[in-house]
């Protein structure tokens, strides 16, 4: 008995030793954001922002997707919960995996909100960025390689009863090894009809449940979704795949609608108008009211894609059909003759490597290019100049009453008065329609090149050219860049910084505000000759053509009256002439 008891004690001790030898299990949780070094922004969307980052531990590059919480009161977004749950439940070589979760704890002391990041492997490109890269030209074996991987990933999702609901070129990631992966499962959803899928593998189950109708980017949205169908199947993903396939051949999206109705119109022009034969019960859908007035269109898809080959046209046409029940599934597409006829799909390892191309970078460059093209215009000699802004409904100044040219400055009492000034000098806003740049002085001895221009100025001469000092000055219709010269050309009075940016038509107000310069009244007969000559020289500095035309008139007058007194009287009358004479016979051609 004692022996047996001793044996049992020894066995118990040995068992305890074995338990101590067993290694402890390490349960790995979420990492912290400080474990990664954020490098640059790769993209952004409604549900998140993606950053390129490097893990400090081993130097590997990852993509961190920050989950946006627009309203924290509603809690964690349900779309993010679905995305995390789906990515943790699936595993395929053509689907982006979820490597880790990173959190940033909220800190009330420093008023810092908490953030959650999804960590996925970094991919060098997305399909949209490659298509917009002018140095990248896809070959047909390369397109077949990408399409075969896309069909394989889509087939795996549908076999797992998962709807992606946002397949597009920007959500297809490609690395420099030629591997394509489906990403962005923010709108993905699991289908509940498991029994039907088990009995009919490869076929879309007839969904009995209503889902959200506003899914999939518009350019890749199927016609049944656009018509308001909410009991859709996996066929909506196949329509998106067909649009992506055609986009890879075309180099751009094939259906770029600006609205839902415009998108339907473009679909019907390519795939034909819906009928009971091509799309049964389409008239019962809630969105058919706006489509009834559309004209009837025949199907032109086979003609539009004929140059890409018979096999490509056959496969793409079988996918882009109006009837979702007749639409080709992913498993059927993999067995299509498109992949078994030459040229055969390329091996991913044999594909060419490219520099990083992402849709977000291309979009930023495109927006910057559009902004620059809006601000500048191309001139006749090929140079770019600043575009003169005209007033229109899109201008925030549109509808404001036109101020007087001789009114007070905009800035009064320390505030800005947009109605009180001549123009907003910080913006190139013109209060009058842009006219021809013809330079004509207000004299009775010089002819007019454009009668219409002269009549317009004659009608507005009282309001536009009459000043408080009684003198009349010509206001050239020029661009602001031509009107504002070097302040040193204005003379001693024009060197002041506060006066250097004033337009030419404000000459009299400038002299009126300067106490050192006394203006001459129209009624005064004994005008100062030196002051008048200075005014003529001042206006000539703005309008060289005015000086040339005035000298031409003075030369002809000098031939008739060679005395200097007549010449001075003629130049003085140039400034005081009250109106235009359009039927003058004097030639104003520069000599």
UniProtKB/Swiss-Prot annotation:
The modification Phosphotyrosine is found at residue 211. It comes from the Eukaryota. GO terms for cellular component: chromatin; cyclin-dependent protein kinase holoenzyme complex; nucleus; P-TEFb complex; P-TEFb-cap methyltransferase complex. May be activated by autophosphorylation or phosphorylation by a separate activating kinase. The modification Phosphothreonine is found at residues 212, 565. It is an enzyme of class 2 (transferase). Residues 491-502 have a biased composition (Low complexity). Disulfide bonds: none annotated. Residues 358-372, 466-482 have a biased composition (Basic and acidic residues). ATP binds at residues 42-50, 65. Keywords: ATP-binding, Kinase, Nucleotide-binding, Nucleus, Phosphoprotein, Serine/threonine-protein kinase, Transcription, Transcription regulation, Transferase. Its EC number is 2.7.11.22, 2.7.11.23. The keyword Phosphoprotein applies. The keyword Transcription applies. Residues 341-534, 549-591 are annotated as: Disordered. This is Probable cyclin-dependent kinase 9. It comes from Schizosaccharomyces pombe (strain 972 / ATCC 24843) (Fission yeast).
